[in-house]
């Protein structure tokens, strides 16, 4: 198992270049330049952290196994119970990450590519603290492996985990647990990890070695996941590359690519991503309800919403039959649902269009609304519902009672839903307004 000769050589070149630069510093220039001084201090802090951080393989393995064991033995996971144990595990892994002295440019680079936002490794290490998300995925992957084991494949189960980040938090803890408990051997399962960020690949490769999991890992690939090809079967795909409202990151493009690589009897996790739309008051949704409770949505708030219906279900059946329309060399779209806006009393004031995401990880386990950073509702600020903006902006879409909205999912550097108004709704709209005494 390796990250590839090219990654290793690039890593050595970067590290050597950094050492050469610091070998004979121009202290007067550093003193004048606050950015240079800041970079130097960051480097020193990181190296001090590395000196003070013992290689805690024993404690890291023990805490990981304890955390996974508690997840697998708990029928219903609760965020407030998981969080303390996961935070403790995060601190240990964060110390290890700091001790690697990965050059700052490889840790902090964050950019937008043709398929969406690519988060920096420094940002990705914190996602392990999204406790219920991590817990449900670990529980789901374990259940999915048990199901796949019944298929009696003639080869080890091959799991592919694209966009895995530096810690691969949705799978690596399970591998640690399996090895420690003797549950699955490397002859039964092996894994390919993929991440486009070199810093993430370096960190993950080091963590795999630190935990002694090399025999389970087929490769740690530092490539664009959409370019990954393999001649052998893929039996399971684990993918979570999205932000709230199924936006910003390239999950759908990646999911389509790996669905096409998956064995006919393979499993894709999450099994379903359910996106719905509603109309709500932004002030009530995002401000007022959290003044008294910051853990879950108020039932009163849920009742105040005007539910429009399902926008999109992303599951294996959809991915294997997904029809894309090419708009230009940079953008492809997928047509989703058309939903009608019911009658809105003009006195109600403006409404905000919200996209809601729920994630069915595996079986009956769902990651619900507000239970994770990826399941917070996303407002579409360009859709003006039941009002005319005082300061119109490019892209504003004015809609109201009786209008039908057709949603498209855009796959480009800014992935997410595009809302359009359907012309064929005009007749229904006029009838609705007339029935409510608002016709012309």
Task: Describe each region flagged by the PLM.
Residues 67-75:
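Intrinsically disordered, low-complexity transactivation/modulatory regions
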Residues 204-205:
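Conserved SAM-binding loop
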Residues 2-59, 81-95, 103-116, 121, ...:
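Class I SAM-binding transferase module
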